[in-house]
């Protein structure tokens, strides 16, 4: 009965709360404060049915709904703030955020943690400030931006003696047309908290310029920030950029041993949420953190300074990280530039704007006091408080004094009357921006030589319009560069002597002589699959001027066009594809073993089950009908299928110059690309996109842009252009590409008359783009190498459409690499290249030892190696037998020397071998013998020190956890 009474009382109290607060109005201890002016409320559907802000999840976890208490903005670009006290006094940890907002009504939201809000009202205009003491940004959400998720085991520390006591929510209402019905809005954030201590603590590292001056009319001004990191290791997982209207692009890097690794790069005019880094970046003692903001002073009549008003500018990069709990710091700052000369080598991407869709552009403004100022009016110098260079470690003081606790409180209005320039001017402008060579210079006067950029919003609109590319809100992946032009940068060093690919001269497959070989691929068993044209030939009579196939009367190819070949002896294991194709072209195989092929005569894409005779599983395009809409292709060239999502990408093709994406079921999703024009094609322009290669762990799709002689890579989810790889040695054509972890293989075409570049294969370090090897066949020669495929052991196959030949190439010296494993994901990379940051590997063999092991395995498993397994076994057994004889002789001599003539020689193999294993006290302990030698330990191989990464647990440490995270102690600071 007592329990029922308590339950009834609780329901009654909750009902009263719902009626009184109307919309999650949690009457915290702040309820005694004066309330914001408000009238009788009528609530939107979103506000109905809520019973309170605190929801228990289990004994230790609870959810906190932090929402606006039913507000109706009256003007566009209204910023409302509200606060909520942490419902517990003890220490807690924020482990997840869930936005509760509609894109139709809310432009963006920020959630701060502090000890005292700026206002005592239930909500207030944010121009009054956010907090009176300290403010730390915990979360940011923006329309069209990706969500921010905390990694498992990571949490923000709140409450207790040192954590924040209040949450302050800031909501920006952009376009208020959705409020024509005067409904109430309860947008906000649901915060998941736990009382369970987290092993990793999240924090914020703020990089901020405090002394940048932007001269009026200056075309390009760089604000550079750099600090040496001298703390315990931190691991970056998200970032956020912030400037006002003059900002073009903000980029952040970790610099280690002169190598620039991208943390994040974003357009500050995009919604300023936290964006996840493509791959976690670790920062350790001695690394340098560097950031650059690119501004323009065009349109200003006087110098622009760093400050808190809309007439001022800001250069902020927020880096969200986590650290091991016992070493964790909740905030760090950098406001200096300790290495200005270092920025001479900053990647060129740092000065190149990122295109955005017009509806994604951020609305900016700071402080209502600037709303009535004319944009061309004289700009006041910042106040003394704004100019003060504060202590580097005082993050909250920086926010309070420099930003006035009002960062991101915007009042700039979008001006629809701004006019664009002509299209021809724009084309030249974009081309110059992309092709300009001295983008990496930090000097503002040198940067002024760049092409004019104009208004940031208009430039991005134009780039979108001319490129026809899907814009992205996500940053480029962690890498050391974006793209270079021929002859620039460290692109073509001498090929490394440690890595060389040569033709396997005893492979008989070179004499198969099928028809024109158009495609090659490898199945799950590493069998070679060939797609060829039989007795059909693609020549000048095959198509008319409208790309309609003219030799339909020949009928389909009457022989099997798909051959499965044994990779060792080149025997045909299986064949199919009879009476189905006219002019085969591209071939790829998905993770389920299905074949994806294209036919340029049929203008179609086929999905085939190699073990079924029921016909194609899926057909895309219309037979013999070229076209450029969602249902037609025009001579499609290749297909790539994303392993995790099943997304289908088609390069289309000889006469469409686009990439088309379909769902796994064949439904059109999107397309991007356009025909290139002029001698300097822009990113996203193609002249025969001929071959595709997926880079799954980076979510990239690389395209062999054949007639432009280059390789372009794009994000598979956003279609953002990531990088271009182009070398003078490519010549005018790149026919085909293939990717294996860490490496990109390519083959070019025959040189034009007067050109010197030979037709050959290339091996490139995917991280840096540099060529590390070139190769050619010995038997026969390349004439039109049409497709290439590589296996993860470095075996390469190339098919030639003119010589009707397939070559097999292998590594003459095993590439030295390391195998890095984290959470079941293995990444192989060149030892000298820092491609993707991975945790430190322990109890792994060194790369040289691993190389020897792999070579032994290869010798014992490859029939074509010419080394007999019997011979190897004999060579291994003989030394063992000799050693056994020696030991037995020594034992016999020892027995005689001590007069033990009656002792029988131990003939038991168990006892003899036992002493070999070190189990007998007087025996020969080979384990101790080898353990005493340099480079060995009793625990096995010494750990490979994988620079800049976590440490993984020993295989036999007996713990149940998958990893053992141990942050190493920092090195002592230099005496100087």
Swiss-Prot record:
Positions annotated to bind Zn(2+): 585, 690, 786
Positions of transmembrane segments: 867-890
Disulfide bonds: 47-186, 81-126, 114-131, 227-334, 293-315, 634-655, 702-713
Cofactor: Zn(2+); Cu(2+)
Residue ranges the record assigns to the propeptide: 26-35
Top-rank lineage group of the source organism: Eukaryota
Family matches, as Gene3D superfamilies: 2.60.120.230, Copper type II, ascorbate-dependent monooxygenase, N-terminal domain, TolB, C-terminal domain
Regulation: PAM activity is inhibited by EDTA, phenylglyoxal and diethyl pyrocarbonate. PAL activity is stimulated by cadmium and inhibited by mercury.
UniProt main location, coarse: membrane
Region (Interaction with RASSF9): 928-945
Topology of the protein relative to the lipid bilayer: Single-pass membrane protein
Assembly with partners or alone: Monomer. Interacts with RASSF9.
Family: In the C-terminal section; belongs to the peptidyl-alpha-hydroxyglycine alpha-amidating lyase family. In the N-terminal section; belongs to the copper type II ascorbate-dependent monooxygenase family.
Name of the protein: Peptidylglycine alpha-amidating monooxygenase
